[in-house]
Amino acid sequence: MNTPDLHSPPSFPESVCVRPATREDAPAILALVRGLAEYERLPPPDAHAESRLIRDMFSSPPRIQAFLGECDGVAAGYTFVFETYSSFLALPTLYLEDLFVLPAFRKRKLGYALGHRFLRKIGGKRVETVDFLAEFPVDF
């Protein structure tokens, strides 16, 4: 099995940027979460849920970490990561909650860049497992 080289990031187009989300990015993150809900044909979060999401992203310490993906300076994708714990292993685990790219920005390596940023977050930490659920895309 090939282990990703986290010290030499793969090449991404210059138009692609992934960075930790800031409080100023909250409206863009919420718009992307609503975009994911629309894509999944689910109701979007209500105002109370959006308020809790912002609180949890930017509390100290944050309950979830958000990474914002941009293409040509436009907010086009995001991922959420949070730490959990395995009672059986007695070690921390990381959970990848969402990894979403707006349809208009797919095929530009932004999803790959978001995933790589998640792997860089893990790099060097003693994390026994990484959990995520992969669902079959609704448009297949």
Give residue spans per PLM region.
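A short beta-loop-alpha structural element at the N-terminal edge
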Residues: 17-29, 42
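A short helix-loop-beta-strand connector motif used in the catalytic cores of GNAT acetyltransferases and
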Residues: 55-68, 95
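Conserved beta-hairpin
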Residues: 65-79, 102
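A conserved beta-strand-loop-helix scaffold within acyl/acetyltransferase catalytic domains
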Residues: 71, 81-88
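Conserved glycine-rich acetyl-CoA-binding loop
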Residues: 89, 102-113, 140
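Conserved acyl-CoA
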Residues: 102, 113-129
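Conserved beta-strand-loop-alpha-helix junction that forms the acyl-donor binding cleft
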Residues: 129-140
